[in-house]
């Protein structure tokens, strides 16, 4: 098994909104950080509905902004249309929302990450190296290991993602992209990471 030359303080798994925020804020604070994504070209790619804002997400974007995050900045630079939702109701439920250009948002995010000097590695993390209840590294699908002191998992909907077409189930993320099959130990049977059960 080959190991990376560099030891990182933090490895962030996944290059969506959460992964970018976690990696950039750690990097800005002087933490030696590596962002791992299954596809470098998909870092910053948004979901099917490329909207930033709304009642719940809008509040979150503002809080991320206050804490030094970057999502709102990327959204401002890639906005196609802005609108205040619920104008016919009381002010307490008014909420700004922007429809963004998906491709432009992605391009801006990748350019900014490069300018900041954040290390990005293309690969798929399949398990965590845990010794004495501490993370020592992450194992990639190609058999290599990235040594680190901590890891943040931001796999989102890609973590063990399934697409249902009729009675068929396919492991997948967004259309045309594969899902992330991540385990907490080298043996998939030992302790599979999965989504939390929905409370019905």
Language-model features, listed with the residues they occupy:
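Short, flexible hinge/linker loops that cap or flank conserved catalytic cores
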Residues: 2-4, 145
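Beta1/beta-strand and adjacent pyrophosphate-binding region of the FAD-binding site
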Residues: 6-16
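Conserved N-terminal/central alpha/beta ligand/cofactor-binding core
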Residues: 7, 24-131, 150, 154-178, ...
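Conserved acidic residues
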Residues: 9, 136, 149
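Short His-Asn-centered micro-motif
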Residues: 13-14, 123, 141
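N-terminal Rossmann-fold NAD(P) dinucleotide-binding loop
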Residues: 19
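Conserved beta-strand-loop-beta-strand element in the redox core of flavoprotein oxidoreductases
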Residues: 130-144
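Single conserved hydrophobic/aromatic residue that forms the stacking wall/gate
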Residues: 183, 190-200
